[in-house]
């Protein structure tokens, strides 16, 4: 049974008024909130009642979700278009039960690879790994893009208070040389270790940045190729290309086909995280995610946070035609969390074809966007409060901070809670009109201005409150959203683990690059007039 069938449309006819729902049920928050360890999930400000939630849960029970959860964790090839298992969960699994994929126990492989990463991190941190000139490494530059950049960068920033190794970690992703130059301007070639993170070792942006970084290094070492081995490690499955680059294969770390890029921070791709926060803290990150994996796998749907998250998001998409989801973390340390989750969500569920290959006739993935509070309040919250677009909101708040500025933390949390309350209750015309009269305006002035100050309210939001932002709790938070994305894909009958939509642009980009360098080429002759004219404008600059 598909989640987005016509039977969902009638749920909107319940005409939920949040203020009324809270007024008539003093146990609403208790009914519509959940807890996993130190994460509190309050979904009471959503447009639901007991009847709607029951209907959504029944749809989940009738779907293939239970079977799909088992299949994913057991290594079935649920990525059907690429014939691959989806096992990022195995990277953080603390159990010892064998998990066989294509005839191999991948638990042993994962354990072995973790140990290799741990040894590298400890070797660099301790100073036993030295640069070519004999100096200790002081800076790590991670060169990767997409999942090889967004996840590690987000975690390294989020866990800045846990940095404990004296290593400075930098990230380079964009093919725009400015991305690389920003890093090279602040590092010393004699004390820098580069991580090249590319499964294929042919990703255009990563390869071009890596080649330029290599040239920069060799320029300092008078073209002595032996220097490369002291200053580069790789995370790739293409050993021949890694060796050709000059990297010792002993320092090439694995990427498996059963780990998608946007779910890879738990793998060797998370090496840059371990360099910043130490390997012990990296393991705590994995442990937090594992706690959610167990909880997700073992908890009934009605008490399962990722399932409820997915049901609400799918309900709004199918019933209210929501095309957007706002994510508002009220913590500066989570400043890259929206960017990270954009890829995880939109690359996973931005699909218009079902698993069988048929075109879907319902809305699937939405635009996920947002920003850090309180900055967003002075930028885009106006649209959330008074715009005419339906946008569900997720607030993420941290109860305690790492600093001693308690007045700042209280103000931050007060603003977060106030925004969710304002979205829910709004302010009516009568409320505004009476306030304006009290402020000294006459009736004519008050009537003229009141309509502009009305805030409709009744706009749904969820608040996720963490006790603290630690490696463990961050791992758990990420895993909650990962599983939410998975559940939505199952409900919509789409494959959340391929990304064919990004391939065409890559292919055309290579053709256009050839055309830019040779206007007699077939690639140039096959261009449309608009693209040809754009190339001409660039050449005539």
Swiss-Prot record:
Superkingdom of origin: Bacteria
* Keywords noted in UniProt: Cytoplasm, Gluconeogenesis, Glycolysis, Isomerase
Report the CDD domains cross-referenced here: SIS_PGI_1, SIS_PGI_2
EC main group:
isomerase
Q: What is its EC number?
A: 5.3.1.9
Chief subcellular location equals cytoplasm
Could you state one GO biological process linked to this protein? Answer: glucose 6-phosphate metabolic process
Question: What are its GO cellular component terms?
Answer: cytosol
Cross-referenced PANTHER family: GLUCOSE-6-PHOSPHATE ISOMERASE
- Protein's name in the database: Glucose-6-phosphate isomerase
């Amino acid at each position: 049974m598909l989640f987005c069938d016509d039977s969902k449309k009638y749920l909107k006819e319940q005409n939920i008024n949040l203020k009324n729902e809270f007024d008539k049920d003093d146990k609403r928050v208790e009914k519509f909130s959940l807890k996993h360890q130190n994460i509190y999930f309050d979904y009471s400000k959503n447009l639901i009642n007991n009847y709607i939630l029951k209907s959504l849960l029944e749809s989940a029970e009738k779907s293939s979700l239970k079977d799909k959860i088992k299949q994913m964790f057991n290594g079935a090839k649920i990525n059907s278009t690429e014939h691959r298992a989806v096992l990022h969960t195995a990277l953080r699994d603390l159990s010892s039960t064998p998990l066989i994929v294509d005839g191999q126990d991948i638990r042993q492989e994962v354990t072995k690879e973790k140990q290799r990463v741990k040894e590298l991190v400890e070797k660099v941190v301790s100073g036993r790994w030295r640069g070519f000139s004999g100096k200790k490494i002081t800076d790590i530059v991670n060169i990767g893009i997409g999942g090889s950049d967004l996840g590690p960068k987000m975690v390294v920033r989020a866990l800045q208070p846990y940095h404990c190794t004296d290593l400075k970690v930098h990230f380079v992703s964009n093919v725009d040389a400015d991305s690389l130059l920003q890093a090279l301007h602040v590092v010393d070639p004699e004390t820098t270790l580069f991580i090249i993170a590319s499964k294929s070792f042919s990703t255009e942006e990563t390869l071009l940045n890596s080649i330029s970084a290599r040239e920069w290094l060799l320029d300092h070492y008078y073209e002595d190729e032996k220097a490369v081995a002291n200053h580069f490690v790789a995370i790739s499955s293409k050993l021949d290309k890694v060796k050709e680059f000059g990297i010792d294969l002993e320092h090439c770390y694995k990427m498996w086909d059963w780990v998608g890029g946007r779910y890879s921070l738990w793998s060797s791709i998370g090496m840059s995280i371990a360099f910043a926060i130490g390997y012990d803290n990296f393991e705590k990150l994995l442990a937090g995610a594992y706690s959610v994996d167990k909880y997700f796998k073992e908890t009934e749907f009605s008490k399962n946070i990722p399932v409820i998250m997915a049901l609400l998001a799918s309900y709004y998409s199918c019933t209210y035609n929501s095309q957007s989801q706002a994510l508002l973390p009220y913590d500066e340390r989570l400043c890259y969390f929206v960017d990270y989750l954009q890829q995880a969500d939109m690359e996973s569920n931005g699909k218009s074809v079902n698993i069988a290959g048929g075109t879907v006739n319902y809305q699937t993935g939405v635009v996920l966007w947002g920003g850090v509070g309180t900055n967003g309040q002075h930028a885009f919250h106006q649209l959330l409060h008074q715009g005419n677009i339906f946008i569900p909101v997720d607030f993420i708040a941290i109860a305690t901070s790492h600093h001693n500025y308690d007045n700042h933390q209280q103000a931050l949390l007060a603003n977060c809670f106030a925004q969710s309350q304002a979205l829910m209750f709004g302010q009516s015309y009568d409320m505004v009109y009476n306030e304006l009269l009290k402020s000294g305006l006459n009736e004519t002035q008050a009537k003229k201005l009141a309509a502009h100050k009305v805030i409709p309210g009744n706009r749904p939001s969820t608040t996720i409150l963490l006790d603290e932002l630690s490696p463990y709790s961050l791992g758990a938070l990420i895993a909650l959203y990962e599983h939410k994305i998975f559940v939505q894909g199952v409900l919509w009958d789409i494959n959340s683990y391929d990304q064919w939509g990004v391939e065409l642009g890559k292919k055309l980009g290579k053709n256009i690059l050839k055309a830019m360098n040779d206007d007699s080429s077939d690639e140039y002759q096959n261009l449309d007039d608009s693209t040809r004219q754009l190339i001409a404008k660039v050449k005539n600059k």
